[in-house]
Regions:
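Membrane-interfacial and juxtamembrane segments of integral membrane proteins
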Residues: 1-178
């Protein structure tokens, strides 16, 4: 396939989601390792829920770890390990690799979207899906809608539109026959 056909081949939403799930198997252990950074701040003992540092530690680790993970992989090669498994790559609209600014912005927007989804659904569940749950559930659904390939004729996600990027499907590489 030529460069033009690679950059125009659209990645399906299912493959994007599956690549994200694969990435979670890397991000969750990385978050556990990142939590070790906080041990010296508590005399080498794990920080437990009653500790005043606990909310700060949890939120900082949960937000920064995936942002750094995605920024690094998207900047270095346009692919995370999950994306590589599904032959997906993130490129500029011109088909070139992402800049560090685009990678970081895209990672922050992804984590922000996921946070809105989580907060919205958690609040809706806590309110037993009553009338008061309409606003948080609506925010969650809007964020989820924005992550999907639903905008414009090109079916790009909101994150793609804001960062001037897109996820493309790479061609299947033929293995040489022996």
């Amino acid at each position: 396939m030529s460069k033009q056909s690679i950059t125009t081949a659209k990645a399906t939403a299912i493959k994007r989601i599956l690549a994200f799930v694969y990435d979670l198997f890397l991000i969750i252990p990385l978050m556990m390792l990142a939590a070790l950074i906080w041990l010296p701040f508590n005399n080498g003992v794990a920080i437990e829920p009653g500790n005043p540092l606990y909310p700060f530690m949890i939120s900082t680790t949960a937000i920064l770890t995936p942002i750094l993970f995605y920024t690094y992989f998207w900047y270095k090669g346009g692919q995370t390990l999950g994306m590589r498994s599904w032959k997906l790559r993130i490129v500029n609209l011109s088909g070139t690799p992402l800049s560090s600014k685009q990678s970081a912005t895209r990672a922050v927007l992804l984590i922000l979207s996921l946070t809105l989804i989580a907060v919205g659904f958690n609040t809706a569940f806590a309110l037993n899906f009553t009338v008061q749950a309409i606003i948080p559930l609506g925010l969650a659904l809007i964020s989820l809608f924005g992550m999907c390939q639903t905008f414009a004729k090109r079916r790009t996600s909101l994150v793609d539109l804001l960062t001037q990027t897109r996820i493309v499907q790479l061609p299947k590489v033929e293995k040489p026959k022996k």
